[in-house]
Amino acid sequence: AAALDKYRINPGNVGRGTKRDIQFSTICKIAVDNNKPVRIGVNVGSLNQELVMRKMQENTDRDLGRSSDEILNDCMILSALESTELALRSGLRKDQIIISCKVSRPPHLITVYRELARQTDQPLHLGLTEAGMGIKGLTWSATALGVLLEEGIGDTIRVSLTPRPGGDRCDEVYA
């Protein structure tokens, strides 16, 4: 743990129920002990399913009429903000926490990060997950990141490209 420059915690896969908070806090405390920053990396593909089910049910019970995409976006934001609060309670300083919320479609990324920027002043790490191969992945990433960066949203970026079959994994570095 001491050799790493930064830790990444995905709140959706550190455990379920009460174990989730305990395991999340344990990682944060290790970061505190080693004076390391943490990126809270929420990913649409690994959201806390208890949170998603609760929000879907709330949408149905209250007849809110929200789409599943809107609910997933809200869940990502809520997960990131709640995890940030837990990280702070676990001893991390505000300046040690970076937030990312990765989705695979540019409009969703823009929506999520605009709302995150409205609700928090934590540094934001931008990037699409599963952006795609080649020119599609580059175009989707450039489109989403360009809009957000032009608005002053985002502190670090990553372009994640899917390698072509048999292709060089380094292509995403060159992007």
PLM-predicted stretches and their roles:
Residues 20, 28, 33, 58-175:
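Catalytic alpha/beta core domains of metabolic enzymes, predominantly
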Residues 1-47, 52-61, 65-68:
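Active-site-proximal beta-alpha core segment in soluble small-molecule metabolic enzymes
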